[in-house]
């Protein structure tokens, strides 16, 4: 798990971006 946490693509920023994208797609 620590490896995924260390990965830049698996960081909280990526999660927030994914949530934003999901919300935008849902609102479309």
Swiss-Prot record:
Q: Which domain of life is it from?
A: Viruses
Listed GO CC annotations? host cell nucleus; viral tegument
Keywords of this entry? Activator, Host nucleus, Host-virus interaction, Phosphoprotein, Virion, Virion tegument
Q: Where's it found, cell-wise?
A: Virion tegument; Host nucleus
Q: Does the keyword Zinc-finger apply?
A: no
Region listing for Disordered, in residue ranges: 1-28
Subunit-structure text: Interacts with the host protein DAXX; this interaction takes place at ND10 and induces the reversal of DAXX-mediated repression of viral transcription.
Q: What does this protein do?
A: Stimulates viral immediate-early (IE) transcription. Counteracts the DAXX-mediated repression of viral transcription. Displaces a DAXX-binding protein, ATRX, from nuclear domain 10 sites (ND10) shortly after infection.
Q: Which family does it belong to?
A: Belongs to the herpesviridae pp71 family.
From the Swiss-Prot or TrEMBL record, give the protein name. Answer: 71 kDa phosphoprotein
Provide the species name: Human cytomegalovirus (strain Towne) (HHV-5)
- State which gene encodes it: UL82
């Amino acid at each position: 798990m620590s490896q995924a946490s260390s990965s830049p693509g698996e960081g909280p920023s990526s999660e927030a971006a994914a949530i934003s994208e999901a919300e935008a797609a849902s609102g479309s």
